[in-house]
Design a protein with these regions (language model features):
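N-terminal Rossmann-like FAD-binding beta1-loop-alpha1 element of flavoenzymes
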Residues: 10-40
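Conserved Rossmann-like nucleotide-cofactor binding loop
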Residues: 18, 47, 191
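N-terminal FAD cofactor-binding segment of flavoenzymes
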Residues: 36, 44-93
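Predominantly flavin-linked oxidoreductase catalytic cores and closely associated redox partners
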Residues: 118, 122, 127-291, 349, ...
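FAD-binding beta-loop-beta segment adjacent to the flavin cofactor pocket
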Residues: 303-334, 456-467, 480-495, 502
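Active-site-proximal substrate-binding core of FAD-dependent oxidoreductases
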Residues: 330-336, 348, 352-397, 514-516, ...
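C-terminal auxiliary extensions adjacent to catalytic cores
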Residues: 394-448
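Iron-sulfur cluster-binding cysteine motifs and their immediate structural context
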Residues: 486-518, 524-547
Length: 551
């Protein structure tokens, strides 16, 4: 069909730290060179920041480069880290505090800040618009615009006003637009659905290890002022997880008597009975955590997958007409459990490459090889190289053995131990059969520290237009009941942190698989963990999904 179109020099998909940093850098470079570069950013959330969720302890290295005067400009970095506490939780009641000497250097946070990444992205968007960037929130990029020569020429935004059966709704239908560009940057975050398509189409991961993921579940709490320690960073390993189902937790004291509390579970976990949501709820009852939360009030909830494969799992970064940046590429430094500064730097490097190409009179559609060269010469590459073994060591040797390896690698060899560990088994292939794994009996939530999924999703402010095509696509509708249920007790009912997937009984006693798509918080776990790789997440109508205030 013929669609309306707009033309830009650069289109960026996603208003997260990578996309917004790229946009700002492009405009800065254009101003320095006295040239015009038109830049458009599309964002599927209802506003910038609505879909942003991160810990976040923020390292300002890339921000210092992008806006050296960020303090004067009012960037929302208000809580410097004042201390790091690391515990190994041995059971539901006991814990050992790790002496500072034994903590990997990458886990020290002097000079970093506890922030809301959503609020930082809102601030970056203000800077970008001040520089002349056009930002369009509420518009979901649905697919890449690829010409007959296999060159990416921009994106197509999703149609609006389509009913559940795919038919236009009278009086409401608006076809999506083509946003054409000389170069297109994809900054959709972890497991971006267009990024996934591009990796497959251009075979970008042919020389990379399998990507690895975690699911991060996070809440914001208002706590008793007498328990509040602004700037304190608490990390834990161990209980409620184990060596076959690994992960770790965080609890960060920010300003205004608030804490961020969360649990990250590696999606390589093996027990199909495991529920990341319920593990997080019971984790909050541990004395190390409860001491801060007791008497407080939960005010926000959300979840998001993270890419943690690191350097060994990076796909090729470029293709004709564009590039992957940030978590769409997989630049998170898992040794630091930080991805914001690395995402920003990748966006800035790509922006430099595009500005250079346009200044040289290139008309677009080519491969940005100068982005790849600049990446390999940057501190970003050095960081990812030094942390390349961190996740693989934990997968191979467990939390204790992997922790010992990482201590030696990071503290003695500075991340340059002369061996590279590879972990090429994809996360979805790690599940045991339900009959081979112990069942897990989760305690009922008490409504004070622990809660159920529905009341949690309510706090994410998630909303979707109900009469639209379901954005969680099953390649084969029979697999959930006929294969996943008998083999794995259909793990989707547990790995989803928002109650999207249910196995329900029909009147005749048979079972059916129900998808409550309106609950989806866009975490992407189902797209990653389904053992049959039968679920594909695509973007729903723009503005749909969570509306995180300051996650």
């Amino acid at each position: 069909m013929e669609r309306e179109y707009m033309e830009f020099d650069v289109v960026i998909v996603g208003a997260g730290p990578a996309g917004l940093s790229a946009a700002c850098r492009l405009k800065q470079k254009a101003a320095e060179a006295g040239q015009e570069i038109s830049v458009c950013v599309v964002e599927k959330g209802s506003e910038v920041g609505a879909h942003i969720l991160s810990g976040a302890v923020f390292e300002p290295r890339a921000l210092n480069e992008l806006f050296p005067d960020w303090k004067e400009l009012g960037a929302p970095l208000n809580t410097p880290v004042t201390g790091d506490d690391i515990y190994v939780l041995k059971s539901a009641e006991s814990a050992t505090k790790v002496p500072n000497f034994f903590v990997p250097k990458t886990m020290h946070n002097e000079g970093n800040y506890i922030i809301s990444l959503g609020n930082l992205c809102r601030w970056l968007a203000q800077q970008a618009e001040g520089l002349g960037v056009e930002i369009y929130p509420g518009f979901a990029a649905q697919e890449a615009l690829i010409d007959e020569n296999g060159v990416v020429r921009g994106i197509v935004t999703g149609d609006l006003g389509v009913d559940r059966e795919g038919n236009p709704k009278e009086g409401y239908y608006t076809p999506g637009m083509e946003l054409r560009a000389k170069y297109t940057l994809f900054a959709e975050g972890c497991r971006g659905h267009i990024g996934k398509q591009l990796i497959k189409k251009y075979n970008l991961d042919s020389e990379a290890d399998a990507q690895h993921y975690g699911i991060g579940i996070k809440e914001i709490w208002d706590i008793d002022p007498s328990k509040h320690k602004p700037g304190l960073v608490v990390h834990t390993a161990g209980w409620p997880l184990n060596d076959e189902n690994t992960g770790g937790s965080f609890l960060y004291h920010l300003e205004n008597n608030q804490v961020f509390v969360g649990l990250i579970i590696d999606l390589s976990y093996s027990n199909p009975h495991l529920s990341p949501f319920d593990e997080f709820q019971r984790y909050k009852h541990h004395p190390v955590v409860k001491q801060y939360l007791e008497g407080g009030k939960r005010v926000a909830y959300g979840a998001r997958a993270i890419c943690k494969g690191g350097l060994n799992s990076l796909p090729k970064m470029v293709f004709p007409g564009g590039a992957l940046i940030g978590c769409d590429l997989g630049t998170l430094n898992f040794a630091k459990i930080k991805g914001s500064h690395t995402a920003m730097k990748s966006g800035m490097l790509a922006a430099d490459a595009i500005a250079e190409a346009l200044a040289a009179g290139r008309v677009g559609g080519d491969e940005l090889s100068n982005y790849v060269d600049a990446f390999k010469a940057s501190w970003l590459y050095d960081e990812l190289f030094r942390s390349r073994n961190f996740g693989a060591a934990i997968h191979k040797f467990g939390a204790i053995g992997g922790g010992a390896f990482n201590f030696i690698d990071q503290n003695i060899f500075g991340g340059k131990i002369p061996v590279t560990l590879h972990d090429d088994k994809p996360d979805y292939a790690c599940l045991k059969k339900a009959s081979e794994a112990p069942k897990i009996d989760y305690p009922k939530p008490d409504g004070k520290l622990s809660f159920d999924k529905l009341s949690s999703v309510f706090l994410s402010n998630t909303n979707h237009e109900e009469d639209q095509p379901i954005h969680l696509k099953l390649a084969d509708a029979s697999i959930p009941i006929e294969k996943n249920l008998p083999l794995y007790d259909e793990p989707a009912q547990r790995y989803c942190p928002a109650g999207v997937y249910e196995v329900v009984a029909n009147d005749d006693g048979s079972k059916r698989f129900q998808i409550n798509a309106q609950n989806c918080v866009h975490c992407k776990t189902c797209d990653i963990k389904d053992p049959a790789q039968n679920i594909t997440w695509v973007a729903p109508e723009g503005t749909g999904g969570p509306n995180y205030p300051n996650m």
